Each structure stands twice: as C-alpha cells, then as structure tokens.
Amino acid sequence: MKRLDFVFFDAGGGHRSAANALKAVIEEQGRPWEIRLVNLQEILDPLDIFRKYTGIRMQDIYNVMLQKGWTLGSAQMTVLMHGLLRLYHGGQVRLLKEFWKQGERDLVVSLVPNFNRALRDSLPATPLVTILTDLADYPPHFWIERQNQYLICGTGRAVEQALALGHPSEHIFGTSGMILRPTFYQPVTADRAAERRRLGLDPELPTGLVLFGGQGSSVMPEIARRVTARAQFIFICGRNKKLADRLRGMDTRFPKYVEEFTSEIPYYMHLSDFFIGKPGPGSISEAIAMHLPVMVERNAWTLPQERYNTEWILEKKLGVVLKSFREIDAGLRELLDASNFVRFRANAVAITNRAVFEIPDKLELLMQR
C-alpha cells in the first residue's frame, strides 16, 4: 500500500478544503493508498513567533485580517514574512525531519505556499509534488521554488511560470482548474422557484449569492446598504454570527436571505443567478462550476496572490471586476445587462473543471517513476 502525506494549513480555508476533497475522491475511487492529512501549523508551532508573544497562531491572525479587511499593504507583509521564513528555515527543516521519522512516505503532496523549500530540504529522498491552489504563482518564493520537485498547475499561466523558473516539462502537470469538493459535481434537483419562496425571496428576481469565505466580511453590510438595482441576495456569513445578525436586522431595498455557516454552497448557488465576493480561487471556481457569472473587486486591499484571478475573469469574460464595491450598483447594471449576462453565463458554462478527478491519476504516475 502506497503512503501519501497531504500537507495543508488553515491560513484561509482553501488548503484544508482542497486536501479533504482530493482525499475523498481517492477513497471513493478505491485506490490502495494510505493518506495522512498533515497540518503544517501544528508541526511548526514551536517556531511561531506570533503565538509565542501573543498566544495567537500566525494563521489565525491572517484569518482575522481577512475577516476585518485589514489587507492593505499585504504585498509588503508577504516580503516581511518571507524574510522571517528564511531566518527560521533551519528550524523548520529540523522540526519537519523529526515529524517524518514517524514513518517513510512514498509521496509528499503539498497544498501550501511559502513552505515548499523547507518541505523539500527536510525529506530530500522522497518525491514532493506541490499542487497550486491559486490560479497562478506570486513570485518569488510563493508557490514555485527552484528545486527538484513536481508541480500540478490549474492554469496555463501557472504552467508557464513553472517553465520560466527552469522546471522541466516532465515535472509539470496541468489540470483543468482548481480542486473543488465532489459535491459541486453532483446535480442539485431542488425547484428554484419553490426554494426561493421558502426562503422569503421573489422567485422571479435576479438573485445574487454574496460570499466572502468562512468568516464573512465587513464589506457585506456595505453592499446591502448600497444596492438599488433590481435584484435580491443570499448572504452567506460563515461562522460570523455577529455579521449575520447585523445583516438580518438591516432594512434593505430588496428581499434577502441570510445564512451562517453551511456546507450546502452548491444548493445556494443553484438558487442564484450570479456571484459576488472576493477574488479567491476557490469561490470563483465554485461559482463558475455552477455556471454563475461573477463580480469581484480589485484594488490596493486585494491580496497580491489573488490579483491575477481578476485578470483571468476579464480574460475569460466571466463577469465584472470593480475598483470598489462602492460601485456595486453600476457593476450590477453591467453584469445584468441582458447581452452581457448571456455572454458571461455562456462562458462559464463552457469551462469544464475536473481537476479533483484528474489529479489522482497524476499522483499514480509520479509514484510509478
């Protein structure tokens, strides 16, 4: 039996989600593999200077920043973080080597950025493959390092970046997109009109799904306050009950439904006509998989590793990119213009993303080499 480690952390929800989705598909396929999910944060906790001085893990600080929208200057913060990672590289390698002593693995699968050099140096004799959970790399030293390893890339842009850094083509595997949970490939049969009525919505109004990750975002009430366009909205607030209560208590010009944490995102997307959120690779890919045109913003507060995603949306003609959600009404007029909407939706329908089902075959191939 082959033994694989899937390495993730919880700085943002996409890394754990991708690891779990891939593991679920592999188990469903009945492959004779033993998969261990490895939380990198737990291994490196002794080196976490934020935890040492504040009692709060670095990944938790990052998640609070996302929730509060404190992302201005994040590009400069990334440079600072990379400096700290270089400073503590030796300690990271030491802790990882101790962890690997628990048993040899046939393949280490990294679903995290920033730490791939430490992963490579800590286990040099074992094949390492990094699966990019972003549409593209944010060089230098983010996803793609100059080292002997394999890479799985969900876009042509990421493949080009890997080749430009000198990785041989036989070490690079392209897929048709980002890893999505298997539930996004299962049909949703609920009657849209009936379900909208059940939620207190108008069955005929254009319906937007507003989603900003597992903790919501402070921009969601601003969106609710500013909208005057002929539309209605489903707000998903995640584990942020305070935000959900605030939205429920708002007087809005449109019908709305507010949900807290839910695993039924495909259901709510089935009830929706378009998506509004941050340009995260997971949310965008989920919306496109459900054939929803998207609306996002790009400005100085946008995370640097997510800025390319807005270019991808415009390049593929999948929706509207705003400078700020203060322009939400103008953005909705553009998105919901009849000819624009038909084109955006047709382009979304034309994209077929089967990455989560493609990757197991690529991992099998790597272990046969």
Stretches found by the model and what they are:
Residues A21-F99:
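Conserved N-terminal ligand/cofactor-binding loop architecture of enzyme catalytic domains
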Residues K68-G166:
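Active-site and donor-binding regions of nucleotide-sugar-utilizing enzymes
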Residues Q149-T207, F212:
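A nucleotide-sugar donor-handling region in carbohydrate enzymes
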Residues A193-R197, L201-L271:
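Donor-nucleotide binding loops and adjacent catalytic segments primarily
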Residues F275-G277, P293-L303:
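Short hydrophobic beta-strand element within catalytic cores of glycosyltransferases
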Residues N340-R354:
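A short, well-ordered alpha-helix in the C-terminal region of glycosyltransferases
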Residues N353-R369:
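C-terminal alpha-helical cap of glycosyltransferases
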